Amino acid sequence: MSFFWLFPFLLHLSFADSLSPLSAPVQNFIHLNHSCPSSILTYSRNSTYFTNLKTLLSSLSSRNASYSTGFQTATAGQAPDRVTGLFLCRGDVSQEVCRNCVAFSVKETLYWCPYNKEVVLYYDECMLRYSHRNILSTVTYDGSAILLNGANISSSNQNQVDEFRDLVSSTLNLAAVEAANSSKKFYTRKVITPQPLYLLVQCTPDLTRQDCLRCLQKSIKGMSLYRIGGRFFYPSCNSRYENYSFYNETATRSSSPPSLPPRSTPQQQLKLAPPPLISERGKGRNSSVIIVVVVPIIALLLLFVAFFSLRAKKTRTNYEREPLTEESDDITTAGSLQFDFKAIEAATNKFCETNKLGQGGFGEVYKGIFPSGVQVAVKRLSKTSGQGEREFANEVIVVAKLQHRNLVRLLGFCLERDERILVYEFVPNKSLDYFIFDSTMQSLLDWTRRYKIIGGIARGILYLHQDSRLTIIHRDLKAGNILLGDDMNAKIADFGMARIFGMDQTEANTRRIVGTYGYMSPEYAMYGQFSMKSDVYSFGVLVLEIISGKKNSNVYQMDGTSAGNLVTYTWRLWSNGSPLELVDPSFRDNYRINEVSRCIHIALLCVQEEAEDRPTMSAIVQMLTTSSIALAVPQRPGFFFRSSKHEQVGLVDRLSINTSALCSVDDASITNVTPR
């Protein structure tokens, strides 16, 4: 049994239990995409809507649902707290796969879209959807998703490319007509070209013929047909094409017209000689030979199977007996998430330079695309990096157990020979520092988006500190470790330096100082003391950088003299009554003064010198979401620089003496062993 538990980040753990009607273990399904727009109303855990939602999801994942048809709708409650939902399984999957996929998606819905009233989750085998509005028999184009094969059509001849595009378009549109006319609203097609082409289209069966056809045609137009494969999802329909068989051809054979065999010429018929006839005497002799040869081979194979089955069972039992602790971080227990190196190598085109996404703290990160079309981020650890076996194991163990929309999701790992690789979900919009520290990119993140990012980071850290099964201290929160999803949703990444706390543990000491210059709290950088308040300090620095578009590590001028780093500069502006001078000029006047001022105030509370003065992440989330909460007066920040270089506060004086080897001169993460 794998020790990678899936546990909900919501406090109401009974929710997961109430949605587990199946006795058999549910297999994992790859999450392709989700839609939970922030503009839609949310609900609270004590609301009637949440009670109705639990009833609805239990109904959709019950044994009585219509898995045989692959489609089920349900409604729970009365207006204004009514919840309407449905699931749609791919038309070729079995009832068992459909049932397991729906059960899996029901369990995951609150991981991806906590407290959202309108949700769509996309998996390869099924789609789950619910809303506070009536979504039945209605076409919806909101919440779309597109996945494209990374390879372009391999032809330098533009005419051939256009011919392929026309073939895909025309065949998909013909399939759309067939699907719209069918009762199941599902159709597949296989076309024999120089290379086979496989296509699949599907609508929710509750749509009319016209609505289904219109939806499929719109989805086909939404795809880039210059790739060798792609798919487009709407909540009401989806279409896909590939150059390999991605569906069960046996299950869909009735919907695909069989290809007639080519007519053979008389000369070709002569070459198709019938098999030799065997006399009764020869038949008996041949049968004896077959028995003598085949039976020992089968017996030998059965012995091998029995041996390895017993060995695997023994290994699995050992894993079950060893509970997960910070010390018991044997990476071999993650077998269920292990990827084959050749598969990763193929997905990244042998780690091609064109697929390189960037340079991480311990190695390079590449984009990979598996044959199923799933895009991933592959972190290939450098053989000369500072991350050893412990850091690698730590990142796998920590991240694989974390499920939250504001955390990057670990899909698996590879540990072969001297290769150590982590496979994450692909986050398309790079990292936060790529936008806020670049003068040409800053304008793409207006204040509304940045305010949402601040809230997302806060919720992600709160989950690490309080709402996950274990208390996780990240220890390297910085702009480069905040990735941005499709909707600029913030996702915390890079857990190679994270630490797990025990149930009653609140702080710890270490001789191994890790982190990034400018983000480390004073007590951690000086004495190796770290706690949840260490991450709070880093969060405060992050907020100031997001608001200003400036790096904390730079030195800033004020009234013609040095004002120190960004934290000190902000404190001086705050003390002078002019905090809004910190605001990124790219906002112009398009921001809410009260929101920006409140965020600056909260950030200064986070970077106070004394750890006990800093708020907890739960208090910070409340401060960000409830404007009526009064804020305390911030005290002087840690690492405060006075106007004269001879008047630096004591901590800074000592830092210059004791931590020359601790702080990196750039933004790279550092790992150094220093005495306390």
Curated annotation (Swiss-Prot):
The keyword Acetylation does not apply. Residues 252-279 are annotated as: Disordered. Residues 309-676 are cytoplasmic. Its EC number is 2.7.11.-. Keywords: ATP-binding, Glycoprotein, Kinase, Membrane, Nucleotide-binding, Phosphoprotein, Receptor, Repeat, Serine/threonine-protein kinase, Signal, Transferase, Transmembrane, Transmembrane helix. Induction: By salicylic acid (SA) or by a bacterial pathogen infection. The modification Phosphothreonine is found at T516. The keyword 4Fe-4S does not apply. Residues 351-631 form the Protein kinase domain. GO terms for biological process: defense response to bacterium; programmed cell death; response to salicylic acid. Glycans are attached at N33, N46, N64, N152, N181, N243, N248, N286. This is Cysteine-rich receptor-like protein kinase 4. SMART domains: S_TKc (SM00220).
